[in-house]
């Protein structure tokens, strides 16, 4: 008699994806991030669901309802802070996951990579709309500034912004629709993640060497299930340390002031995970140019497979490319820092230099280094 997990139509799918899946024997902890992202998504959906039970998406009561969740709902404070800080953990895992893909050449799995970029955009959109919901000062002004960027689109810009707002300013209609979108998008993300996994399992996982591992595969369970459980425990430990000791560390104090359209905060800035893109946006004096640079800073990931000029897939044996990769990481950290600073000297010029360096590294320096490494192989 065959095992039920191998014969049952539904169990068979799960078995082939998580139990009997042939996995490379040498994948490192950088390959844990996919499962961690899955855990983050489930956690966000669950905490978000419980928050939605008590939240009201009306401009007059939204701020009060969040305060009510924290003060009066049983364990509401922990659910709220797990949701807010869970988003930060989500983005830490997400950026590390993308970085891993760039370092080890995982972008050569075209379908998997492109779905991943779409997922990144979807998660960013969800996080942005979620930040608007508490209806604090930074929620309101963040929504106003970011949605207003669409007015830079020629001809249709102004109409588009007013259509998104549902009026002539960010108001009740905007908040209600943002709540609706914020609720539905995580389920779309979950569906896309399944497609992402489907395409990955068509080719099998990459590994640190970038060399085919077809001759040396091991079953996913128990080897990588136990490894993923360790990763999950560390993720939950980090999240709970953040939630229980410094829940407001990554938030903005301005968001504890109810939204007031008549009073602009001195420094409008998004959550920390968008600061690098915000710095690129601000570094260009032209509105349309800034918006294009903002979109391209993420969309540039689509070009990664085209910019791959090396004969080797992974950067494991490419020291020049490794140096440039870590310079890129340092550059992104610099941009993140600049995004949180006021628009004044010397931050303006640092931001502009870091923005130019960002595009220069990805579009010119890294492909050139790969070509130099190719020629060195002939020696």
From Swiss-Prot:
One of its GO terms (cellular component) is mitochondrial inner membrane. Its main location: mitochondrion. The keyword Signal does not apply. One of its GO terms (biological process) is mitochondrial electron transport, ubiquinol to cytochrome c. Pfam families: Cytochrom_B_C, Cytochrome_B. Its cofactor is heme b. The keyword Acyltransferase does not apply. Belongs to the cytochrome b family. This is Cytochrome b. The lineage of its organism: Eukaryota, Metazoa, Chordata, Craniata, Vertebrata.
